[in-house]
Amino acid sequence: MRFINLIVVHCSATRCDRCYTEHDLTTDHLRRGFSGAGYHFYIRKNGDIKSLRPLALPGAHARGWNDKSIGVCYEGGLDECGRPADTRTPFQRHSLRVLVLLLLKDYPGSRLCGHRDLSPDLNLSLIHISEPTRHSLI
């Protein structure tokens, strides 16, 4: 079993008025050379939580942190015009909270952060995307 001490929340950086399925996400990651989706979990706009990668395997979502983290991504993050925005639906907010609380229970002492907290240099154009923190979930 891997040592986990970090839960990293991402957005898919897709427009909130468009559908971006777990299949779309996986296909995009395969095109980028990954072996599959880089995130362990994906939360759709309707709140469905999709398991994309076994927790026993490191993710491909936060360079330098993958070996000790779990990647959670929610669908959206951009408004209808493509501008960064907190587009989480009430369903996504609920599912994200439940999932994170379960993960924190399974991996006590883990820290919760947004992807922007680990690689702000890579997210300059999306710096204002709201990736939830522990305080906004609990």
Task: Label each residue range with its predicted role.
Residues 2-111:
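Active-site-adjacent loop/helix surface patches within enzyme catalytic domains
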Residues 56, 119, 136:
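Residue-level detector of flexible, active-site-proximal loop/helix-junction positions
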Residues 110-120:
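Acidic carboxylate-rich catalytic motifs and surrounding loops in phosphoryl-/glycosyl-chemistry enzymes
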Residues 10-11, 115, 128:
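Histidine-centered divalent metal-coordination motifs
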Residues 55, 124-127:
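Short aromatic-enriched loop/helix-cap "lid" or pocket-rim segments at secondary-structure transitions
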Residues 16, 120-123:
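Short catalytic/ligand-binding loop motif for oxyanion handling, primarily in non-cytosolic enzymes
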Residues 127-138:
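Single conserved hydrophobic/aromatic residue that forms the stacking wall/gate
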